[in-house]
Regions:
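Low-complexity or membrane-interfacial segments used for flexible interactions
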Residues: 1-76, 82-87, 92-107, 113-117, ...
Length: 214
């Protein structure tokens, strides 16, 4: 996908996001994980609706972290452009995943370029359904994400709705059903995310980070 040119006030490497309102994220299926259950570092391809590769996402974690903490593990996620330059960085610290411990819910810091904070994703305390807040670099809530009561994709897609602060729905984050074999023998996931075309590019990037947190 060609890089849009002349985008003012846009972090380098995020120009792609100004011209799209939907992204598809496909996790690479690792044969070692499928046959042995050994947890490998996750890798993803980020595409537009035409199937063109926009970014690559690579998890940076230690083996012990992956095996001991599983899906709740802390991680750093590097987002690379088509030239293999790191343009986004997601950091998720180790936190408790239980709603019964509201003092240490899930959180993620989003930086672009790496080292420059552009937003945060924070889990909100909720008993029945998963709730998250998308925040800007100043910690101000911009969007809210609300998930379903059941977040397991048993035989269908799982949708998380995205709302403005006044309750207007503006997008979705969807975990897509990938079939019986892939769902039961690997943790490889496919996701879709959509948002308004004119949404601030930093908020779009933070929503992409939310996809890896929820």
């Amino acid at each position: 996908m060609p890089i849009p040119q002349g985008i003012p006030n846009c972090p380098p490497g995020l120009e792609y996001l100004t011209a799209i309102d939907q992204l598809l994220v496909h996790q690479k299926v690792e044969l070692l994980e499928a046959f042995t259950g050994f947890e490998t570092a996750n890798k993803y391809t980020v595409k537009n609706t035409l199937g063109q590769k926009v970014y690559w996402a690579m998890e940076d974690t230690g083996c012990c972290n992956r095996m001991c903490c599983g899906a709740a593990r802390a991680f750093d996620m590097k987002i690379l452009d088509t030239y293999q330059n790191e343009v986004l960085h997601f950091n998720r610290p180790l936190r408790c995943s239980s709603c019964w411990f509201p003092c240490c819910l899930q959180t993620m810091e989003v930086t672009a370029p790496p080292g420059n904070v552009i937003g945060y994703v924070e889990q909100d305390w909720s008993i029945l359904t998963p709730q998250f807040s998308i925040k800007n670099q100043n910690g101000e809530t911009v969007l809210k994400i609300s998930g379903p009561f059941c977040t397991f994709s048993i035989c269908g897609d799982v949708e998380f709705e995205v709302f403005t602060k006044d309750g207007t729905e503006v997008g979705k984050v969807t975990k897509q059903w990938t079939g019986f074999v892939q769902e039961h023998f690997t943790d490889a996931d496919n996701f879709g995310i959509n948002f308004p075309m004119d949404l601030d590019v930093r908020v779009k990037a933070t929503m992409l980070g939310a996809l890896f947190l929820i």
